[in-house]
């Protein structure tokens, strides 16, 4: 492709609102153009990258036995009402009516649609298992779209759905799709980790995320420094502490702590280690009118996903109202504790072996020092309530945990019968008996993969594309293409020979200054660059550089095509 026939639109500066490197570089390189908050046009250069990702995904889906179809973006409300997600999904689900006043939505996922298709088309165990996928534009009405295409309202997803006669079959396909995802992200040249994860709003049982490692990632993953264990921090469990409880040394003492309502201010006011404090979180019970008290160390981060799964706790997790707290404790938040509380109390594992805690006294402006479980309040039930921290024992018992940030680009779920039961997706088994199908679902954020790749692969000059994702494999940058016959003839000859060799080549024949052409080639991140100028040609050479190391070297003009094709095929 010649640049004069293509479309290149680059910027020297990124817009002020762009925070992430990927957002800045995608705008500057002209990969995307913003139309509204969270809505983007994929320009020709960006679309080439998107298609490269899609091609790899399609190849690996076919290898895994998944069959492509295409489902609608606009979906009928009755399917979502049947599954129970019409109300559950909340305002992120964009609802609309047609001219006949019928309810529809812009689908963020397609579980309901594919379940409806399968229940109409498949009725026998002889037709199972089946695995379908599509690549489609989605819409999720994000309350605060940000970070460019990383968290946009409109995005491209690959969704796959599998249906099975039994769980063993589901597990086989789940493993095959897990392996396919590993191949996809490896082929795309990404540094990633598969991690155990929560199922979230999709539901089901088993689940793994595929996280691209990046400091800008919104997710935190925990992994063992010894074994293969890895999980999203939301799911990574903490373990009960070993050994005996520390003996109590202090008496329970009420101290005046005026205007002290946070752990930080408590630590400063009493001049104590934060590890000696307990914080109280009060949530609604599944029994109406009752509340549950949750206790964890002041320096630990509360994990609401774990708390929601506790017996007796209302789901979804709901914080108790101020009125309910005052009614039950006689004090406001910031001064709460278990002394005298008659309701259910859970305490985190990390508090079980400690002694002489500092905790709220259930009186505004007062705290207790020297609090001990069993002596000053009944022993609570000790459970896992917090996020893991670096240095915690790995849940598999091998090594210690480390933390890293990641960008979720893929997610696989064992849905089991969450949707098939609700929507009566059944089949006749070999005995002629009706059975509910097992179901799996498998997603990849195609547009997010592009942004995540840039987060991992960039420098001060621009993007550094991996081999599989680059919009072009080679860029030829001729100096004075319009004015120098020698440069033009050499550029056209090399361009033609590379095309004949099967390379994906961009010949930048724009009538621009040399500095603009060179800067754009680095900003666009095309892996291989050939610079052709009159001075080098007089010596029989061209300049060749790989974008990842930017080390330019002179190569004989008669050898450059073989040199580049060898690198491309290596």
From Swiss-Prot:
Transmembrane segments: none annotated. Keywords: Aminoacyl-tRNA synthetase, ATP-binding, Cytoplasm, Ligase, Nucleotide-binding, Protein biosynthesis. GO terms for molecular function: aminoacyl-tRNA deacylase activity; ATP binding; proline-tRNA ligase activity. InterPro entries: aa-tRNA-synt_IIb, aa-tRNA-synth_II, aa-tRNA-synth_II/BPL/LPL, Anticodon-bd, Anticodon-bd_dom_sf, Pro-tRNA-ligase_IIa, Pro-tRNA-synth_IIa_bac-type, Pro-tRNA-Synthase_IIa_type1. It is found in: Cytoplasm. It is an enzyme of class 6 (ligase). CDD domains: ProRS-INS, ProRS_anticodon_short, ProRS_core_prok. Coiled coil: none annotated. It comes from the Bacteria. GO terms for biological process: prolyl-tRNA aminoacylation. It catalyses: tRNA(Pro) + L-proline + ATP = L-prolyl-tRNA(Pro) + AMP + diphosphate. Signal peptide: none annotated. GO terms for cellular component: cytosol. Its main location: cytoplasm. Its EC number is 6.1.1.15. Catalyzes the attachment of proline to tRNA(Pro) in a two-step reaction: proline is first activated by ATP to form Pro-AMP and then transferred to the acceptor end of tRNA(Pro). As ProRS can inadvertently accommodate and process non-cognate amino acids such as alanine and cysteine, to avoid such errors it has two additional distinct editing activities against alanine. One activity is designated as 'pretransfer' editing and involves the tRNA(Pro)-independent hydrolysis of activated Ala-AMP. Homodimer. NCBIfam families: PRK09194.1, proS_fam_II. Consists of three domains: the N-terminal catalytic domain, the editing domain and the C-terminal anticodon-binding domain. Belongs to the class-II aminoacyl-tRNA synthetase family. ProS type 1 subfamily. This is Proline--tRNA ligase. The lineage of its organism: Bacteria, Pseudomonadati, Pseudomonadota, Betaproteobacteria, Neisseriales.
């Amino acid at each position: 492709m010649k640049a004069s026939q293509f479309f290149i639109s680059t910027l020297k500066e990124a817009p002020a609102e762009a925070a992430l490197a990927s957002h800045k570089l995608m705008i500057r390189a002209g990969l995307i153009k913003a139309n509204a908050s969270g809505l983007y046009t994929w320009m020709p250069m960006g679309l080439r990258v998107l298609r490269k990702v899609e091609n790899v995904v399609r190849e690996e889906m076919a290898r895994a036995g998944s069959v492509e179809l295409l489902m609608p973006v606009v979906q009928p409300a009755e399917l979502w009402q049947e599954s129970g997600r019409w109300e559950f999904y909340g305002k992120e689900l964009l609802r609309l009516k047609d001219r006949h006043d019928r309810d529809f939505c812009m689908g963020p996922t397609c579980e309901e649609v594919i379940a409806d298709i399968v229940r109409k088309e498949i009725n026998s165990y002889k037709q199972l298992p089946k695995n379908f996928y599509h690549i489609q534009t989605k819409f999720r009405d994000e309350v605060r779209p940000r970070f460019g295409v990383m968290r946009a309202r409109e995005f491209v997803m690959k969704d796959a759905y599998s249906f099975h006669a039994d769980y063993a079959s589901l597990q086989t396909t789940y493993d095959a799709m897990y392996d396919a995802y590993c191949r996809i992200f490896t082929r795309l040249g990404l540094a990633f980790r598969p991690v155990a994860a929560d199922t979230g709003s999709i539901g089901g049982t088993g689940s793994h995320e595929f996280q691209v490692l990046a400091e800008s990632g919104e997710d935190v993953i925990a992994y063992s420094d010894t074994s293969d264990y890895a999980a999203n921090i939301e799911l990574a469990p903490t373990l009960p502490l070993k050994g005996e409880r520390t003996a109590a040394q202090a008496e329970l003492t009420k101290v005046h702590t005026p205007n002290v309502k946070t752990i930080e201010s408590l630590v400063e006011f009493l001049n104590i280690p934060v590890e000696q404090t307990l914080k109280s979180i009060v949530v609604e019970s599944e029994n109406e009118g009752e509340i549950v008290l949750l206790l964890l160390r002041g320096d630990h981060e509360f994990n609401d996903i774990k708390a929601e799964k506790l017996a007796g706790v209302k789901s979804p997790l709901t914080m108790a109202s101020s009125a309910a707290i005052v009614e039950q404790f006689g004090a406001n938040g910031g001064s709460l504790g278990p002394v005298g509380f008659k309701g259910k109390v859970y305490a985190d594992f990390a508090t079980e072996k400690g002694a002489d805690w500092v905790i709220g006294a259930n009186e505004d402006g007062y705290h207790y020092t020297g609090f001990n479980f069993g002596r000053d309040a009944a022993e609570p039930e000790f459970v896992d309530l917090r996020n893991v921290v670096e240095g915690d024992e790995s849940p598999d018992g091998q090594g210690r945990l480390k933390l890293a940030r990641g960008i979720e680009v893929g997610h696989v779920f064992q849905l089991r019968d969450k949707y098939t039961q609700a929507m009566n997706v059944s089949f006749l088994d070999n005995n002629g008996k009706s059975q509910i199908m097992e179901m799996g679902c498998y997603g990849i954020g195609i547009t997010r993969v592009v942004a995540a790749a840039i987060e991992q692969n960039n420098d001060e000059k621009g993007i550094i594309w991996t081999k599989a994702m680059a919009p072009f494999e080679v860029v030829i940058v001729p100096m004075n293409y319009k004015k120098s016959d020698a440069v033009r003839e050499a550029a056209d000859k090399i361009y033609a020979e590379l095309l004949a060799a099967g390379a994906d080549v961009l010949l930048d024949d724009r009538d621009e200054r040399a500095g603009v052409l060179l800067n754009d080639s680095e900003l666009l991140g095309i892996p291989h660059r050939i610079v052709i100028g009159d001075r080098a040609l007089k010596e029989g050479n061209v300049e060749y550089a790989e974008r990842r190391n930017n080390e330019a070297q002179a190569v004989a003009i008669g050898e450059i095509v073989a040199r580049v094709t060898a690198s491309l095929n290596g």
